[in-house]
Amino acid sequence: MKLSVLTFVVDALLVCSSIVDAGVTDFPSLPSNEVYVKMNFQKKYGSSFENALDDTKGRTRLMTRDDDYELVELTNQNSFYSVELDIGTPPQKVTVLVDTGSSDLWVTGSDNPYCSTKKKDTTGSSFKQVNKDALASVVESVFTEISYDTTIVTSEATATFDSTASTSQLIDCATYGTFNTSKSSTFNSNNTEFSIAYGDTTFASGTWGHDQLSLNDLNITGLSFAVANETNSTVGVLGIGLPGLESTYSGVSLSSVQKSYTYNNFPMVLKNSGVIKSTAYSLFANDSDSKHGTILFGAVDHGKYAGDLYTIPIINTLQHRGYKDPIQFQVTLQGLGTSKGDKEDNLTTLTTTKIPVLLDSGTTISYMPTELVKMLADQVGATYSSAYGYYIMDCIKEMEEESSIIFDFGGFYLSNWLSDFQLVTDSRSNICILGIAPQSDPTIILGDNFLANTYVVYDLDNMEISMAQANFSDDGEYIEIIESAVPSALKAPGYSSTWSTYESIVSGGNMFSTAANSSISYFASTSHSATSSSSSKGQKTQTSTTALSISKSTSSTSSTGMLSPTSSSSTRKENGGHNLNPPFFARFITAIFHHI
């Protein structure tokens, strides 16, 4: 879902509201020889969306390959992956964010009252100060650099937004583009309402419609989209989540006389038109230092992960609300632990309580229940700052003594360096923020700081997710089409042991011990040797398996093997952390520390 980097409180994942009927048209006309769609995106970080977008040196234009797939270029702004659409006749260019945490496509209308007539002067604040205490006053001058409206939430206030745009709330709409329906000869409005709100207090409302629509030469006309004639977000969204999360189905404001339904969103349109064979896609976000990554619709790239690819079911945490099928990408976390260095006696299990986890590419950092974050913070030496709601700690600089956070998803393990979850406050400071924030919600959100080290395949047809440790070495592509199931993926040992009800999080246990004679191998950073052209499609030869091996030969509570992601200068930052939105974030944190 689309969450601001500066979100202080995330109590609601997504709020959808009233829509009567979005309507569905014929499927698009797509080339019959295409079997998957490939999106290569660039990762950029800047003090604002506009500044990052202006940095276009070396940026590749959208293009179409002549062989068996479509190539679409994306850019990543503050952990948001964006793509440029052509809408209408004649075509108008509009940029939208690609989001796994929502399912609708909407664009900003040219009549949006929040749009300024020219790029916003950053001397004026675009933030509503709910509680003008001393802290808010200190950081106000820093916050003005963000060009979309949001609400700063303090302990004495709750997040709100109103639908009346004031001068201080105006946003720059020119950078990402708007859609003028009156200038398109082919636009058809359904005259039905669209409305959606996000956890960062951005919102959009307007009407549903249809028009000529394409991503470069990839014609996706027939995909329903909404034109937001009122939004406080600088950019629209291309949601690629489950159909149950479409606002026509899960909108909380649907009245009793408004029938809820699902429609064919972007991944479904690709399948039903024949451009891909399954409603599935894989995400390779690449490591935090890289400037590029990949989304494959309808395919998996075996060269982008290390070890085995394990499959687990998507779970339904909203069945009690009447949803018979899952509506968001949630899976079961069966254990959370840490390791210190390369010593096997330094393995620690924080909990084995089953907790729902949302995998969300639209969230920059990660969020966990308050009590679980406290367990983790105590283990890694972080202390809580009540001034702004995050844990702080010393930045990690000695790689040989580095700790890692280990996630048990059901008998297979994914590991991230602790420094991957650290946010550098200032290059001259040794203080880092733990990029796992506490929240009152009993679920977990794993955002970009987790996904950057994980290869994820979202199988919407089978309601499953497959994951493996990401492989950052440049070993070429081993792309295989996804048909009835994800090729080469193994069912996780704990596939059937899923979350069923919310429980209090209990500390302790041993997630590194399972049934007798079972063996799990884990590779945090593994390179693959190139395969010959005559080898089977998707096969790979592993040249290094030194990262991590967890051997389980008994059912006792002791564990054997080493748990340590391999050190690699190509995948690690020497300064002991990853800068989030520099230099803005550095100035924001520096201002806070000067105040407290």
From Swiss-Prot:
GO CC terms of this entry: extracellular region; fungal-type cell wall; fungal-type vacuole; plasma membrane; side of membrane
Region (Disordered): 530-578
GO molecular function: aspartic-type endopeptidase activity
InterPro entries membership: Aspartic_peptidase_A1 (IPR001461), Aspartic_peptidase_AS (IPR001969), PEPTIDASE_A1 (IPR033121), Peptidase_aspartic_dom_sf (IPR021109), SAP-like (IPR033876)
Disulfide bonds: none
Residues in Peptidase A1 domain copies: 81-468
Superkingdom of source: Eukaryota
Lipid metabolism keyword on record: no
Residues the record marks as carrying a glycan: N180, N190, N219, N229, N232, N286, N346, N471, N517
A GO biological process held by the record: proteolysis
UniProt keyword Glycoprotein present: yes
Keywords: Aspartyl protease, Cell membrane, Glycoprotein, GPI-anchor, Hydrolase, Lipoprotein, Membrane, Protease, Signal, Zymogen
pH and activity: Optimum pH is 4-7. Optimum pH is substrate-dependent.
EC number: 3.4.23.41
Catalytic reaction(s) noted: Hydrolyzes various precursor proteins with Arg or Lys in P1, and commonly Arg or Lys also in P2. The P3 amino acid is usually non-polar, but otherwise additional basic amino acids are favorable in both non-prime and prime positions
Biased composition range(s): Low complexity: 530-570
Lipidation feature positions (GPI-anchor amidated asparagine): N575
Localization of this protein: Cell membrane
Signal peptide interval: 1-22
Pfam families per the UniProt record, alphabetical: Asp
Active-site feature positions: D99, D360
Function: Cleaves proteins C-terminally to the most C-terminal basic residue. Can process the alpha-mating factor precursor. Required for cell wall integrity.
Comment field (misc): Present with 538 molecules/cell in log phase SD medium.
Family: Belongs to the peptidase A1 family.
Name of the featured protein: Aspartic proteinase MKC7
Species per Swiss-Prot/TrEMBL record: Saccharomyces cerevisiae (strain ATCC 204508 / S288c)
Name of the coding gene: MKC7
